[in-house]
Amino acid sequence: MPANAPITQDVHTIPRKLPDGPVNLVGLTRAAMRDALIAEGTPEKQAKMRVGQIWQWIYQWGVRDFDLMTNLSKAYRAQLKEKFVVEVPEVVTRQVSEDGTRKYLVRIAGGHEVEVVYIPDEGRGTLCVSSQVGCTLTCSFCHTGTQKLVRNLTAAEIIGQVMVARDDLGEWPEIGAPKDETRLLSNIVLMGMGEPLYNFENVRDAMKIAMDPEGIQLSRRRITLSTSGVVPEIARTAVEIGCQLAVSFHATTDDVRDTLVPINKRWNIEVLLEALRAYPKVSNSERITFEYVMLHGVNDSDEDARRLVKLIDGIPAKINLIPFNEWPGAPYKRSSNNRIRAFADIIYKAGYASPIRTPRGEDIMAACGQLKSATERARKSRKQIAAETGLAGA
């Protein structure tokens, strides 16, 4: 299929509209916020200034109560309270792994739930953000792929995940305090539930807010979007977001990738690589990260490693090797440590960085490929769970 093939409506799930009521200012672009303020009575000449003030309160200071926005007049604050709200997703549960990883189950409009993961590391902290409720891609090794797509998240629900994580980490700076460059949440990866490029506009708007210099202030180099290979949107990502790009590659032949990542049947390896070769030039990114989950006897041979090196020749790249994180009923097994190291060594000797990802948060089902909303898991009957885990009749 050509790279410019249109994305059909069957992969777009329109976010459910909230009931009539106050407008949530979270997730609006600056232009949309300006229009919303004008529509509710803010004089047009003042609107740009008001957007700047409110924007700073929400995204720089983490303030959600209009009464605390003290550089606005009391009358204007009362007007805002009548017409608008500043709302973020509700944290339903918070789990902390033995390794310090935190997993949040957050509830969004309609009662739906998604998972968000914070991964602390030396000198950095990464938040893994979801973009959809469920997923449409049905990647055979991924737990999220077993949960049907319900809908896209709104920009408010995406940036709201960042905001609730900052709440939990105590990351909002004290108003008036000297600027502190030390951050617990320093990076965002769009690697949670869903395919970000099947929700492009909302992901773009949320990440623009994250990168805004008067708000959360994350550099585009600290934001990584991971795609399974929605080729028509890759060039658009380079132009309209400009963040780092990771691709869920996972196989070196179309036959294997068709099974592991079924979107490959639509945009195969050759077409995907063509789009990836152009990305660093357009986005000014240093390199592309190729994510490669290590599956015993499926994609982990020396031949696979050598073929991978040939496929990506000429692309500035890092190959991130991911030991498979098993989940109940998973049809695959993790490659042995020796096999993973041998695979990595072939890639390294060819001149590519080939770090082996250390699994994080496995004890709370927060590792790569394990995310699935708790309510979805809870819907399974005891019989289904027993069958999946091999405990039937025990």
Swiss-Prot record:
Primary localization class, coarse: cytoplasm
Gene Ontology molecular functions: 4 iron, 4 sulfur cluster binding; metal ion binding; rRNA (adenine(2503)-C2-)-methyltransferase activity; rRNA binding; tRNA (adenine(37)-C2)-methyltransferase activity; tRNA binding
Reaction it catalyzes: adenosine(2503) in 23S rRNA + 2 reduced [2Fe-2S]-[ferredoxin] + 2 S-adenosyl-L-methionine = 2-methyladenosine(2503) in 23S rRNA + 5'-deoxyadenosine + L-methionine + 2 oxidized [2Fe-2S]-[ferredoxin] + S-adenosyl-L-homocysteine; adenosine(37) in tRNA + 2 reduced [2Fe-2S]-[ferredoxin] + 2 S-adenosyl-L-methionine = 2-methyladenosine(37) in tRNA + 5'-deoxyadenosine + L-methionine + 2 oxidized [2Fe-2S]-[ferredoxin] + S-adenosyl-L-homocysteine
Gene3D superfamilies per UniProt: 1.10.150.530, Aldolase class I
Residues annotated to bind S-adenosyl-L-methionine: G194, E195, S226, S248, F249, H250, N325
Family: Belongs to the radical SAM superfamily. RlmN family.
Protein name as it appears in the record: Dual-specificity RNA methyltransferase RlmN
Provenance organism: Roseobacter denitrificans (strain ATCC 33942 / OCh 114) (Erythrobacter sp. (strain OCh 114))
Gene coding for it: rlmN
